[in-house]
A protein has these predicted regions:
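Non-ligating segments of multi-cofactor redox enzymes
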Residues: 2-313
């Protein structure tokens, strides 16, 4: 007898049963999304602080409530239940919608920042309090980025709390994102009108040792001198030594903001990545090609600077 259940239903015949905490969390998240949408279209611009608090607290606290309701009552151990069947993490309707929203957000961020004026205005109170400068689309992006790493990092810890390594790694990458990539640069802008990123150095920051960039950094006095020396030490001493002993994971999984977002917010989607040998070969070619271009470009500019423009004019 064939026991397979072949359903013709347009709806999910076996929906996930959400408990009370999960439903409360989803409701709070929905309020945060509503506040975000109102701010984006410019509604309630005179209540920027209220919209900001309701957005960040709604998304943050709502997410934590939902994740605690999901993992808090379960025993320790890897839990990837329904990852291949969830609409949002298996190329379903919610996944496509999320992809379109995120793509639209990035297009607006880089090419049409004027369409983000509502969000920029919402973050004005926080930017003035923290940085002492007007808000910008990059401050909006950095704040959302940091909130995503922190909230999804706590979720990751709940999910992988049986692994001490994963817990420590997540705490580390969340710390570097919050302190070194968001809070410290903001404080430095307020104190010195300069925004250093101490975890971002050459060749990852490809123009970090361009002559014109070094000249600009050194114009910021002793802070600039420290940043230049710090970057050179990390590039030519710290990175080779740490990579020799630990591989690239010391940076990509423990320090880097990109890796932080991938390991936290990207965790539910990691099964979608191409794990074929062909994909790995393409990745190697791209990485080494880009590194080669950066090396050549940097060397040409340094030689040209030493020759006082005699090479490139």
């Amino acid at each position: 007898m064939n026991n397979s259940d072949i359903s013709m239903s347009l709806a999910n015949p076996h929906p996930a049963n959400y408990n009370t905490l999960q439903k409360i969390g989803l409701a709070v998240i929905a309020l945060g999304v509503l506040s975000l949408a109102l701010a984006w279209v410019g509604i309630g611009s005179h209540q920027a602080l209220l919209l900001l608090l309701s957005t960040l607290l709604g998304l943050g606290i709502g997410g934590l409530i939902f994740f605690y309701g999901t993992y808090g009552h379960l025993p320790e151990g890897i839990k990837n239940n329904r990852a291949f069947f969830s609409s949002i993490s298996s190329r379903g309707a919610l996944g496509w919608m999320l992809g379109i929203v995120l793509t639209g957000f990035y297009v607006s961020l880089y090419f049409f920042p004027e369409y983000m004026s509502g969000l920029t205005n919402m973050f004005e109170p926080l930017s003035q309090a923290l940085r002492g400068t007007p808000s910008s689309q990059w401050f909006v992006y950095g704040t959302f980025y940091t909130v995503a790493v922190l909230v999804m990092g706590i979720k990751f810890i709940m999910k992988y709390r049986h692994s001490r390594y994963q817990v420590l790694r997540t705490i580390s990458v969340s710390f570097f994102q919050l302190i070194f990539a968001w809070l410290l640069p903001a404080i430095m802008v307020r104190l010195y009108n300069y925004e250093p990123y101490l975890t971002y150095f050459w060749p990852l920051d490809y123009d970090a040792i361009f002559p014109s960039n070094i000249k600009y950094i050194l114009s910021n006095g002793r802070l600039g001198q420290f940043v230049v020396v710090w970057g050179l030490v990390l590039t030519f001493i710290g990175t080779p030594v740490l990579t020799y002993f630990f591989g690239k994971r010391w940076y990509c999984s423990w320090v880097c903001g990109c890796g932080g977002l991938a390991e936290t917010a990207g965790d539910p989607f990691r099964h979608l990545s191409d794990k074929s040998l062909r994909a790995w070969k393409i990745e190697r070619v791209l990485i080494h090609s880009i590194l080669g271009i950066i090396l050549i470009m940097t060397a040409l500019l340094l030689v040209d600077s030493a020759a006082k423009g005699g090479l490139l004019g």
